[in-house]
UniProtKB/Swiss-Prot annotation:
The chain crosses the membrane at residues 555-575. GO terms for cellular component: membrane; trans-Golgi network. Its EC number is 3.4.16.6. GO terms for biological process: apoptotic process; proteolysis. Residues 576-702 are cytoplasmic. Glycans are attached at N65, N124, N446, N454. This is Pheromone-processing carboxypeptidase KEX1. InterPro entries: AB_hydrolase_fold, Peptidase_S10, Ser_caboxypep_his_AS. The gene is KEX1. Residues 511-538, 686-702 have a biased composition (Low complexity). It catalyses: Preferential release of a C-terminal arginine or lysine residue.
């Protein structure tokens, strides 16, 4: 009977372990181990038709230094297999350097925003409806990405090498996506990242090794990009003047004008040696030019009784105000919800973190180390990239730090595809989206410049649906509409609507001969709307796979229940069958008898009474607890033993939450030079504009 009981217990344990529903994908499919099935607010705030399929986790790149990149991927389960969106992968990067792309996921282009209850709510302008979007925390150490101390990256080519390693690992997890069209999008210092990554991809494609597949790079979208640092900084004073933020009556006007002239001389020196193959030291030192913005913000502080949060111009949206010396670091205000959301242990578990580090919007340690002192600014890469890849440079018109004026300045100096700058920069097309004028466009020779009205440094934060239409421009899904003999509009449509071909407001009596040439192959078909019923193969696969998994799990669970019942029955039968006579025979000698003392008889009676009060389960557990060979007199556990159990529990409660050392090195809470990151200042290194003279040694980051 004892052997039977042990067998039953072992079988019960093994079967129970097998019956624990695994995280979907812990089988042979590597993708499923990254599946995200729950988040705070997901099931109560997000409509079923809108819920994306999500994958997230830390992918190991280099085991020797524990480098892992965190990604969060969103895909639309309702997309049609014949839709252009079904074979599109969009990699989104935020800036810094050292600022997390979770800003993009939860404040800009992702399907969710975070509310004051720290739960997800819907973002109706999510880009995942136009293609799979993958948000990546990089370089190593940014956001939820991780690396060993002292293994920080320093230069742009190294960053690109690491990112291609991430792509290699990513396509090992999702091999079915390797033939997808690839788009890179991002903002701020991503204006340095994206061109370098694109250049590395094109070089890889040109020298494929055996077994490698080409990456189908289709387009780059750079928003308010930090592409040509000194040229961008040269635009600050003209921008302030143009928008009536400062005038010649300001007490610091002459000081500001002097710095602007010095910056102009630096830029002139850079331009004279732009085509040199050697790095220009003047181009690597942008402290003087960048310092102009710090002085402009200081010179325009409102001290005449203004509220504390209204004293300084917001450098990311000049129509807004902030406290001094923040000048924008407290914006967007939803960041105060995003930070605790991503620091929630439950959320970290939902996102499949292997290293439970504390999330920071921007890492000062990463930013300080990534100084790019051996890298050409990415503006030098644009001419060669434009030979092969279309590039969109879009700007929120209200941004100061990476404003559209600075972008146009470096574009007009750039030589690409046989000519310099835009031949006719005044030939602007009004951008009409969903029958509203949202900006203007200049297009020539694979380069598109877009200035977007009523938007900030973070265009998708302000205008999510308009920002999503940038992908329609990137994929040529737009119409050119004649307004009159000299003016035209660029027209995009709501999600899922295909372009109609060339439309004229006052068409002639006979159709234009070139109408057909502007119509896409899909324009003759009915508008391709996203079906709410969902007809994609991926959605069908998910729908069909889940019931199968559930059925298997239920069968295993049923088997476990039957085995448990059987085991309990055997244990109960064993308990009922134990010898009960007062005089017990000794198994070793049939003639000798073991006499029970009177106090023992009383104890047996008390136990019998107690056992009658216990239920079936309690009796069974008593059977488990009975010590073999000691009967009712099994030795009680000592106090020392109990203390050991408590000590063991205490030791087991380890904390692995924060792999970023909270030391002076992080300098969290310190304010420095204004930063060029996506949507905020580098909260660890660049928050003190009052000490700009000393802190200007640190690179102002986007």
């Amino acid at each position: 009977m004892l052997i039977s009981s042990i067998y039953t217990i072992c079988l019960f344990i093994i079967t129970s372990v097998l019956a624990i529903p695994p995280k979907e994908g812990s089988d042979s499919d590597p993708a499923k181990q990254y599946l995200v099935t729950d988040l705070p607010g997901l099931h109560e705030n997000i409509d079923d038709d809108f819920k994306p399929i999500m994958y997230a986790g830390q992918v190991e790149l280099f085991p020797e230094n524990n480098t892992m990149y965190f990604f969060w991927k969103f895909t639309d389960p309702k997309k049609s297999t014949d839709s252009a969106y079904s074979k599109r992968s969009i990699f989104w990067l935020n800036g810094g350097p050292g600022c997390s792309s979770m800003d993009g996921a939860l404040l800009e282009t992702g399907p969710f925003r975070i509310n004051q209850d720290e739960k997800v709510v819907m973002n109706n302008g999510s880009w995942h409806k136009a293609g799979d979007v993958v948000y990546v925390d990089q370089p190593a150490g940014t956001g939820f990405s991780y690396t060993d101390q002292g293994k920080w990256l320093h230069d742009l080519p190294d960053m690109a090498f690491y990112f291609l390693k991430f792509m290699e690992k990513y396509y090992e997890i999702y091999p079915e996506e390797i033939d997808n069209d690839i788009y890179f999008a991002g903002e701020s210092y991503a204006g340095q990242y994206i061109p370098y990554i694109a250049d590395a991809i094109l070089k890889r494609n040109a020298k494929l090794e055996e077994g490698q597949k080409k990456y189908n790079l289709k387009s780059l979208l750079i928003g308010n990009g930090w592409v040509s640092p000194n040229e961008q900084s040269l635009s600050y004073l003209p921008f302030f003047i143009e928008n009536k933020l400062i005038d010649k009556e300001n007490p610091r006007w002459m000081e500001l004008l002097g710095d602007h002239e010095k910056c102009q001389r630096i830029v002139d020196g850079i331009d004279s040696k732009f085509d040199d193959k050697e790095l220009n030291p003047a181009e690597l030192d942008s402290n003087l030019c960048e310092g102009i913005l710090t002085k402009l913000l200081s010179a325009t502080v409102n001290g005449d009784g203004a509220d504390d949060d209204q004293r300084c111009i917001n450098m990311y949206d000049f129509t807004l105000r902030d406290s001094w010396p923040g000048c924008g670091i407290n914006w967007p205000f939803e960041l105060k919800y995003v930070t605790p959301f991503l620091r929630n242990d439950e959320v970290k578990h939902d996102l499949n973190l292997r290293v439970m580090k504390t999330w920071r919007e921007c890492s000062g340690r990463v930013g300080r180390n990534f100084n790019a002192q051996h890298s050409f600014p990415s503006v030098h890469l644009l001419p060669d990239l434009l030979k092969q890849v279309p590039i969109i440079l879009f700007s929120g018109m209200n941004d100061i730090i990476c404003n559209s004026k600075g972008t146009l300045q470096y574009v007009l100096k750039l030589n690409w595809n046989g000519r310099k700058g835009f031949e006719n920069p005044d030939a602007k097309l009004d951008w009409i989206h969903d029958d509203k004028k949202v900006g203007y466009v200049i297009q020539e020779r694979n380069l598109t410049f877009i200035d977007i009205y009523n938007s900030s440094h973070m265009v998708p934060y302000d205008l999510p649906e308009v920002s999503r239409a940038l992908l329609e421009i990137a994929t040529n899904n737009y119409d050119i509409r004649d307004v009159d003999e000299t003016n035209q509009n660029l027209v995009t449509y709501p999600l899922g609507v295909q372009k109609k071909g060339k439309i004229e407001v006052n068409p002639p009596s006979t159709p234009s001969s070139n109408d057909d040439s502007t119509t896409s192959e899909t324009s003759d078909s009915q508008p391709d709307t996203v079906s709410s019923a969902g007809t994609s193969a991926e959605a069908e696969t998910e729908t069909e796979a889940e019931p199968t998994v559930n059925k298997v799990a239920r069968l295993i669970q049923l088997a476990v229940i039957l085995i448990v019942i059987w085991g309990l029955y055997l244990l109960y039968a064993s308990w009922r069958a134990r010898p009960s006579p007062i005089m017990k025979k000794n198994g070793g000698n049939g003639r000798k008898k073991n006499v029970q003392w009177a106090d023992q008889l009383s104890r047996f009676e008390e136990e019998a009474d107690a056992s009658q009060l216990k239920g079936f389960f309690a009796k069974t557990m008593d059977r488990f607890r009975t010590t073999e060979g000691q009967g009712s007199y099994a030795r009680a556990q000592s106090d020392d033993y109990i203390d050991d159990i408590e000590l063991g529990e205490g030791i087991g409660e380890t904390q692995l939450d924060d792999f970023i050392i909270g030391s002076d090195d992080e300098r969290e809470g310190e304010l420095e030079q204004p930063t060029h990151k996506s949507g905020n200042m580098d909260t660890d290194t660049n928050k003190n504009m009052k000490n700009s003279s000393n802190e200007s040694k640190n690179k102002n980051t986007v």
